[in-house]
Amino acid sequence: MALQAQQQPTPSPTRDRVGSGEWLADTEKLPGAAASPEDVVVASTHHAAAAARYVPPRATSHTAEPNPGRDGGGGWYSWNGARRARHDPPAPRRQQPAKTHPPAPPLPAAPPPPPPPPPAASPAPAPRAPPPHAQVRSADRVVPAILSRKRRAAVMQRAALLARAAAAGXXLAALTVLAADTRRGWARDSYSNYAQFRYSEAVNVVGFLYSVFQFVALAELMRRNTHLIPHPKRGLFDFTMDQVLAYLLISSSSSATARASDLTENWGSDSFPNMANGSIAISFVAFVVFAICSLISAYNLFRRDM
């Protein structure tokens, strides 16, 4: 029967689709199938066909069914043909939206650390006392400067006093000589007959009076150390008057000189023009003294030492 099975075509085994899960009842196995799987020959005594099939060795793992069904009748089977129930995978779970927890409220900001306390103010170091030799040196410089300034002021006061006295004397001598020149010479002429001589006489009078006033004021200053007229513009007044009187003296003396020269050229040398020339010469000396007084008053105005 084995030889007859080899000559016939090998039918493919089919499963019972009725849901029994076993092979057909009319299929029989040979006695030697349990001993050696390699020599297994399946014989079918079914009335439709008898065929034998060689079953190769298979692994013990599950093998997919060659014709699985969709209606639940199929399943899994092992190498020996035993059918096993197929376990369908569980239905996928409906994807739920991920639960998001609300964000935690922000923590309150920590207060800034208090500023560091300011460093304690260290007491200022006491000023170092200057060395004694420096004090002595500064005193040596200051005291002589003060003394020299005082000496210079005293010298200028004495010089101004002498200049005022000289200006007063010169102006007095000039006006006295010219005033005495009356009814002189062969013509018995007088200075009052000529404008140039009258002009010179008037300037000498004013110069004399001003010089006497300045002499008294300087004497009072040197004796009591106080000004006769304590006015802030006193220095400017002295400087202006000295300049004006010096200019008047030089102009009056020049005009009187021209007139005396004209008389000498026209009428010859005589006592009248000679006395006029003497007064004019003294007026020039008074002009020089007033120029010196103007320099002293300018020094006092800009240096304020007196």
Swiss-Prot record:
Ranges where the record places region Disordered: 1-139
Pro residues composition bias: residue spans: 100-133
Cytoplasmic-side positions: 1-158, 223-242, 299-306
Subunit structure of this chain's protein: Homodimer and heterodimers.
The keyword Cell membrane is assigned to this record: yes
First-listed, main subcellular location of the protein, grouped into a coarse class: membrane
Organism: Zea mays (Maize)
One GO location term (cellular component): plasma membrane
Assigned protein family: Belongs to the Casparian strip membrane proteins (CASP) family.
Location(s), subcellular: Cell membrane
Transmembrane segments: 159-179, 202-222, 243-260, 278-298
Top-level taxon: Eukaryota
Membrane-side (Extracellular) residue stretches: 180-201, 261-277
Stated name of the protein: CASP-like protein 4A1
